[in-house]
């Protein structure tokens, strides 16, 4: 899931902050309950024909195509704004999060105007752009499962996610055939994109020569289970241990230091592949996730001060007041248009990994990072943005180390 943030700043006293947080939590809980109850599709998955499958030879089927203009080239305000390098050292195959919240379909059509608007104007500039220093970015559109698929572990929701994965796999195969040409690559993902990234890493990449070309996977925002790195499940990948680790999984799930996951209400599921080519959906609640602290790139539990945060970054909209927010989650565009990225907000939050495997942050200074918080103080929509500059630098670090290793 990914919601918009506008370029807003505020100065508040400690008392105002306290009451603002209490009010925010109440509004989040009530608003979330109202929002979620409206999302269930009116029919079951098998009762209607899915939207047409993508043709990945068509540029329009890509949110980011190597030969088409897009907003993955955005750089933070005040940073080097030169054009993307022509000689990129690696690629990133980026799988976007959920942007379809409707109840009309279990899987969004590829030409769904509002879902694509959210991807093109918020997700690509706000998330995929973190990789544009030295990486060529490709990002497919796919028949994503509607957001409701994660709210209940239903047969229809699982079927919708499996259909979405077939598109992601097809897009990856197209990328390999037409663009990769033996180059190293990253996997980048968030939320639903990470659900599919987990499966792609296990079923298509792990144990093959592709694993040797995988610099790292930034599989953020869907509780990548720690137990998938036990008993030989993954042959080629391990959880990241340092800033320069390669062929590894980098993951975190962000909460306010006053919040935390609500396992009792969480019905989202994770795919576990079986050795016979099949798999099983397993509820993720109470599973310890893989965890990396993006302010230190370690997986220990020491607190890391906000001074280590090199800059949180958010999308700046061309006309925030012109956005028709009442239409969010509907069928039509609501007037979103990304103008630029903000300047880095240095020292925005501190971060601490706790024993439960989740990342806990101090309350953000900038209002733009508090307008779309989810229940439990979940900063899911800011998993990338709060650590943007640290991520941007780290992608370059890992790539440089990988290329040095290959040159030996």
Residue ranges of model-derived segments:
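Basic, amphipathic N-terminal segments that precede the first structured/catalytic domain
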Residues: 12-82
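Active-site catalytic motif of lipid deacylating hydrolases and related acyltransferases
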Residues: 33-58, 94-184, 347, 354-408
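Proline/glycine-enriched tight loop/beta-turn segments at coil->beta junctions
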Residues: 85-90
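Structural recognition of the beta-strand scaffold that forms the well-ordered cores
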Residues: 91-95, 138-141, 186-187, 216-219, ...
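Active-site-proximal beta-strand/loop segments in catalytic clefts of secreted hydrolases
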Residues: 95-98, 141-145, 190-191, 220-223, ...
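Surface cap/lid and interfacial helix-loop subdomains adjacent to catalytic sites
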Residues: 164-182, 202-369, 376-378, 382, ...
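Gly/Ala-rich beta-loop-alpha elbow adjacent to hydrolase catalytic centers
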Residues: 189-193, 197
């Amino acid at each position: 899931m990914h919601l918009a943030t506008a370029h807003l700043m505020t100065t508040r006293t400690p008392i105002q902050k306290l009451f603002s947080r209490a009010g925010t939590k109440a509004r989040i809980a009530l608003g979330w309950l109202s929002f979620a109850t409206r999302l269930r599709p009116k029919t079951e998955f098998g009762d209607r024909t899915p939207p047409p499958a993508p043709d990945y030879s068509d540029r329009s089927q890509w949110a980011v195509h190597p030969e088409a203009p897009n907003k993955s080239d955005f750089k933070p305000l005040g940073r080097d704004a030169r054009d993307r390098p022509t000689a990129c050292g690696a690629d990133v195959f980026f799988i976007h999060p959920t942007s379809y919240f409707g109840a009309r379909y279990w899987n969004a059509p590829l030409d769904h105007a509002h879902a694509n608007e959210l991807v093109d104007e918020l997700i690509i500039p706000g998330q995929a752009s973190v990789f544009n220093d030295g990486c060529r970015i490709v990002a497919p559109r796919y028949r994503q499962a509607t957001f409701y698929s994660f709210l209940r572990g239903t047969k229809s929701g699982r079927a919708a996610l499996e259909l979405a994965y077939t598109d992601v796999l097809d897009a990856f195969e197209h990328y390999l055939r037409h663009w990769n040409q033996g180059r190293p690559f990253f996997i980048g993902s968030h939320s639903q994109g990470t659900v599919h990234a987990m499966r792609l890493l296990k079923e298509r990449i792990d144990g093959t020569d592709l694993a040797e070309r995988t610099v790292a996977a930034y599989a953020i925002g869907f509780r990548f289970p720690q137990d998938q790195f036990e008993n030989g499940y993954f042959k080629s990948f391990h959880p990241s241990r340092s800033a320069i680790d390669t062929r590894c999984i980098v993951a975190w799930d962000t909460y306010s230091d006053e919040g935390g996951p609500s396992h009792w209400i969480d019905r989202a599921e994770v795919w576990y592949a079986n050795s016979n080519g099949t798999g099983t959906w397993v509820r993720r609640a109470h599973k310890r996730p893989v965890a990396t602290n993006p302010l230190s790139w370690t997986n220990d539990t020491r607190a890391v001060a906000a001074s280590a945060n090199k800059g949180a970054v958010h999308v700046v909209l061309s006309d925030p007041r012109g956005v028709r927010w009442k239409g969010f989650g509907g069928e039509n565009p609501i007037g979103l248009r990304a103008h630029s990225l903000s300047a880095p907000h240095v020292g925005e939050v501190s971060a601490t990994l706790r024993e439960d495997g989740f990342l806990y942050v101090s309350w953000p200074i900038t209002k733009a990072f508090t307008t779309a918080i989810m229940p439990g103080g979940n900063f899911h929509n800011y998993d990338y943005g709060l650590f943007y500059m640290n991520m941007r630098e780290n992608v370059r670090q890992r790539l440089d180390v990988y290329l040095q290793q290959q040159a030996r």
